Amino acid sequence: MGKMQYYTVKDYVELLEKRGMLLENRVEGEEDHVIRNLTYNSKEAGADTMFICKGAAFKMTYLREAVERGAVCYISEKTFDLEQQVPCILVKDIREAMSVLANFFYNRPWENLVVTGIGGTKGKSTSAYYMKAVVDDYMEALGKKESAVISSIDIYDGKSLVESHITTPEAVELQQHLRNALDCGI
């Protein structure tokens, strides 16, 4: 389990290069900067952030806001012409890269959790909550914490209970919730 480890921009570049995802590395001068936040939401950007430019509806104003809030670099499928030069990492497929980056950033939390996935067209949330109830009763009998759940209804990760807004969380949120569950001893 252990405390979360943070990595440098160079570590992320090397990871993407090793996976064959890197198109271009334009992070001169920021290679040793430690990344402590990974997000695609400009409102969540702050100091030491690697900002992910993703989606068909992505606007350059999001990147500008992230940089104003402290993002040290961005990752994208293309470069953006900003007023100031911002280090960037260019990748072939931003969605694939985002999942690899999130897994790395959150230190692969799933490796230390028991994870069950439920698929199908009907009854996934119902099945998940039945399963959670059974597991929680068992855990309570052992004097242990209740289980986490990620569903289309809500998400409980030991740290917070929030309403779910989409059926499947993005890779960054998914790994964050798994990390929270791990850190909370679930």
Task: Give residue ranges: language-model regions.
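Phosphate-binding loop of NTP-binding sites
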Residues: 97-186
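N-terminal leader/targeting and accessory segments in enzymes
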Residues: 1-100
